[in-house]
């Protein structure tokens, strides 16, 4: 009952597979979309335990996170895997929330910008320009190089580096930050509400 109306921002809650039906029921009368935390790129086959894009769509999911740092770190996900998942999501009309970014070691090496550009190019490889409009959380400069200024302006870029109530307003005021991919702060309802309120002020 404490969730404010998201007048100027879109709210998407991405939950584990088993919680998707309950989340859709819980948010059905609110302006909150439900997303998944991952998908598998094959449409069908003997892939025990995997969940395809078609399965997510059948559940009523609108969004899916692809390429999260934890997937890359713990499950060995590569840029090629991310690209396959992007194609699978777009093929069935899901909005992919594509995560790109560097590790602490890579940041200290000074290769952040180069790495992000490479990850973004890899994620979008082979994606037609008309489909790129559906994609969230890419790097505007790289998209502009790939598809032109019109598509670059339509892309939503979200900050995923631990946005919280204390830094949300400052981060969201940055010209190239359109939103946040909220992690730990979203687990505390009051903190999540504070971030939404900050977004509504922008």
Question: At which residue positions do the language-model features occur?
Answer:
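Active-site loop-to-helix "anion-binding N-cap" substructures in soluble metabolic enzymes
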Residues: 1-202
